[in-house]
């Protein structure tokens, strides 16, 4: 019986690669943790602490400058209790004044603006006294401020209530002896959806073309001359869709988390040293 000759097996040289020949396995997909799920952090941090945000001007952001300012701001907050308040909240500020007999002055009004960052942060209170609108601008970290009280904690439809200058006086009139209203802990901050009525023109700004929600029927009250001029007015209503501009002018989530952790560390160090028991990072809506 014929049998075929056995074939000789020739071993070829094997090339050893520096990497594994088998394909790498894909990394497991991790669920993104939202700010609400991060333990101890406040979801509404940009609204409660706008003074700790980065500058909206990209070229003015300096990490070292922001770090030094935050240290001074935290030390100042250890000496004075700065409560939570928003644009639209009714706030009372007691400041020292050497020219008065009592050596201090107390002003009550609605917060219409919060602007600037860091140690330069300012907020404006407005009230009507004897049918005259009075606005007082306070530096939040001014050492002459002795006490800040939130008499009524609430929000408005807009983040800037400058249109109260042209509104009827009844929308910015508050009693100086107003009693503070307690806000239940853990409940959302109420939003006052009141829409103000403006005085007859002329106004300080063209509110009929401004993107504000807190004014009632500005087009009807506008003068015919401005209505005819509307087709020549440049309205940049497309800016709200510009994602790149919003990214450059707003603070990132990573920066907010970093600042909050730094504030928590500062609190723990002061509490461990027994210097104070005051809390800096707090929120009426997130507290349980």
Curated annotation (Swiss-Prot):
GO cellular component: mitochondrial large ribosomal subunit
Entry keyword set: Mitochondrion, Ribonucleoprotein, Ribosomal protein, Transit peptide
Disulfide bonds: none
Main location: mitochondrion
Molecular function GO labels: structural constituent of ribosome
UniProt subcellular location: Mitochondrion
Membrane-crossing segments per the record: none
Gene Ontology annotations of biological process type: translation
Family: Belongs to the bacterial ribosomal protein bL19 family.
PANTHER family: LARGE RIBOSOMAL SUBUNIT PROTEIN BL19M, RIBOSOMAL PROTEIN L19
Protein name per UniProt: Large ribosomal subunit protein bL19m
UniProt source species: Caenorhabditis elegans
Gene encoding the protein: mrpl-19
């Amino acid at each position: 019986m014929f049998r075929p000759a056995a074939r000789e097996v020739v071993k070829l040289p094997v090339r050893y690669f520096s990497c594994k020949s088998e394909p790498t396995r894909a990394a497991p997909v991790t669920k993104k943790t939202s700010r609400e799920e991060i333990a101890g952090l406040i979801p509404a941090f940009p609204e409660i602490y706008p003074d700790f945000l980065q500058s909206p001007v990209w070229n003015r952001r300096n990490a070292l400058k922001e770090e030094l300012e935050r240290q001074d701001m935290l030390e100042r907050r250890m000496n004075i209790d700065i409560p939570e308040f928003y644009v639209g909240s009714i706030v009372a500020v007691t400041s020292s004044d050497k020219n008065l007999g009592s050596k201090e002055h107390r002003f009550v009004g609605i917060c219409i603006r919060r602007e600037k960052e860091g140690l330069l942060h300012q907020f404006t209170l407005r009230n009507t006294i004897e049918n005259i609108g009075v606005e007082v601008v306070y530096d939040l970290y001014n050492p002459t401020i002795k006490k800040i009280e939130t008499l009524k904690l609430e929000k408005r439809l807009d983040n800037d209530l400058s249109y109260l200058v042209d509104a009827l006086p009844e929308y910015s009139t508050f009693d100086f002896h107003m009693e503070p209203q307690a806000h239940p802990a853990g409940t959302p901050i109420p939003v006052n959806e009141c829409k103000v009525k403006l005085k007859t023109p002329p106004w300080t700004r063209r509110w009929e073309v401004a993107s504000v929600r807190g004014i009632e029927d500005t087009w009807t009250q506008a003068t015919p001359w401005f209505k005819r001029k509307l087709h020549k007015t440049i309205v940049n209503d497309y800016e709200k869709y510009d994602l790149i501009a919003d990214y450059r002018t707003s603070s990132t989530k990573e920066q907010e988390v970093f600042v909050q952790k730094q504030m928590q560390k500062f609190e723990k160090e002061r509490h461990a040293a027994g210097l104070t028991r005051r809390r800096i990072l707090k929120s009426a809506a997130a507290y349980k």
